[in-house]
């Protein structure tokens, strides 16, 4: 095996550059990194305080803390696609909601894009006789996005007794994440 030392490797004009052949493994040396296949921008935000959701109303979910924000693109509880980062994005969100009166009956969550719903989840206990105290669910979807598109999470909530529900900050279960898909 030999070693080639170069600063730049370019194919001939109009051709492609191939490293290895079918079945070969191309590895990076210790301490080296690749910059081609990176899932950025990426973000993860979560709640750090409870948020009341009024019965029969749709509310924007407010995320107070960012655990990850590679491109400084998450602010005011929304993710905005940075310039030059067009493509397909994977989004996921989770919520933990409680109704202390044991009257949680229905909820919808929405992924909003540029102020309008583009993805909706629906859950309804049925006829009001099957109600819950606390529910935790997670959802995900893929959305096409271009620079300056922005994404937010909204929630609609109902209870049998018209009482408010609370999105809980405990256990970091209320979060919103997203990242650009490689090759999309």
What are these regions (language model features)?
Residues 3, 11-13, 73-75, 105, ...:
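Residues that act as N-cap/strand-start positions at coil-to-secondary-structure junctions
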């Amino acid at each position: 095996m030999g070693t080639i030392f170069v600063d730049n490797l370019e194919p001939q004009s109009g051709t492609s550059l191939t490293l290895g052949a079918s079945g070969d493994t191309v590895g990076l040396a210790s301490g080296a990194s690749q910059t081609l296949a990176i899932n950025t921008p990426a973000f993860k935000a979560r709640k750090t305080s409870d948020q009341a959701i009024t019965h029969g109303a749709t509310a924007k979910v407010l995320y107070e803390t960012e655990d990850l924000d590679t491109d400084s693109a998450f602010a005011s509880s929304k993710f905005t696609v940075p310039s030059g980062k067009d493509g397909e994005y994977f989004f996921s969100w989770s919520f933990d909601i409680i109704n202390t009166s044991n009257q949680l009956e229905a909820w919808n969550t929405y992924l909003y894009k540029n102020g309008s719903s583009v993805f909706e989840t629906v859950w309804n206990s049925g006829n009001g006789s099957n109600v819950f105290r606390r529910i935790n669910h997670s959802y995900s979807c893929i959305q096409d996005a271009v620079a300056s598109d922005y994404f937010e999470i909204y929630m609609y909530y109902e209870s049998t007794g018209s009482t408010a529900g609370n999105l809980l900050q405990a256990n970091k279960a209320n979060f919103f994440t997203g990242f650009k898909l490689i090759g999309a």
